[in-house]
Amino acid sequence: MSREIEKEHQVGTLSNQQGLDEQGLDLQKNDQQNHDEKSHIVKEHFDSEKIQQRYPAIERKPLTLTINGEEVGPIEVPLTMTMIDFLHEYLDLTGTHFGCGQGICHACTVMEIHPDGSKSETRTCIFGAHYFSGKNIVTIEGQATKKDGVLILTPIQQAFIDNFAFQCGYCAPGFVAGATVFLDRLNRHPIKRANLEKAIEEALNDHICRCTGYVRYYEAIRDVALATPGCVID
C-alpha cells in the first residue's frame, strides 16, 4: 500500500470513528422529562389509525418494562410486534440495529439485567415486544452516562474506539452488549490469563462483523478484561 493510499485509509477510518454519535454508541438522552414525553407519545401512537392499519384485529398483550433505567408502560402491544420495531418506531431508540431478521447476526442484541444484577444478551428481532414485559433491558443508548454535562463512555465503548474495532459500525451496538455481558461474567467467574483469548472468541462468536475480521474487537475486549481487576487470574 502506498503512503498516499495508506494516509487516505487512516483518515477515512478516523472519520468513521468520528461518526460514532450517529451509530448510537454514545447516546444517553432519556432523562425523566424525555421519558415522560416518550411514554405519552407511545400511548398516542398505539391509538392511531396507523397502528390499527398495520396491525388490524390482532391480539394484543400488556407490556411494562424498564429500558435504560426508565419504566415504560403499561401499554398494550400487538402480539406480532417485535421488540426492535417497538424500540425504533415508538420510543425513537434506533441505535439497536436490524440485520438479518432471523436472530443470527446479533446486530439487534440488547443487554438484559436480571434481579440478581447479572447480565445476559437478548435479541430483539426475533422476540415479540410483549416477551419483554417485566424485564429490565439496556439498549446502546443506555450504555454511556453523563456527568456534569460530559458524556462518559463505558470501558468497552472507549476500547472499541481506541482499537479502531469497527468501520461501518452497524454491528457495533450488538458487540457492545455482548462484550459487556462477557465482562460481567468474568467479574463473577474469573478465568486464567491463558484461557482469555479462547473465552473471548467463544463469547462473541455469534456476533457477525463484515468489516474488520473481528481481530480488533477481540483485542479491545482483551485489553479491558486485563485492565479490570478481578476478571483475569494469572
Q: Which residue stretches match the model-derived regions?
A:
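Signature of N-terminal electron-transfer/Fe-S-associated modules in redox systems
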Residues: 2-234
